[in-house]
Curated annotation (Swiss-Prot):
The gene is sspN. It is found in: Spore core. It comes from Bacillus cereus (strain ATCC 14579 / DSM 31 / CCUG 7414 / JCM 2152 / NBRC 15305 / NCIMB 9373 / NCTC 2599 / NRRL B-3711). Keywords: Sporulation. Induction: Expressed only in the forespore compartment of sporulating cells. It comes from the Bacteria. The keyword ATP-binding does not apply. It holds the Pfam family SspN. This is Small, acid-soluble spore protein N. One of its GO terms (cellular component) is endospore-forming forespore.
Length: 44
């Protein structure tokens, strides 16, 4: 129980930190891409 708890704690902050950084970068890039992709998607 001690092992999984330690692993989970290390994984939780690591995952959130990585996701936050990835989401922020992806969101920024996607937002700009959405401007040009939105009309294409609407057309499609």
């Amino acid at each position: 129980m001690g092992n999984p708890k330690k692993n989970s704690k290390d994984f939780a902050p690591n995952h959130i930190g990585t996701q936050s950084k990835k989401a922020g970068g992806n969101k920024g890039k996607q937002m700009q891409d959405q401007t040009g992709k939105q009309p294409i998607v609407d057309n499609g």
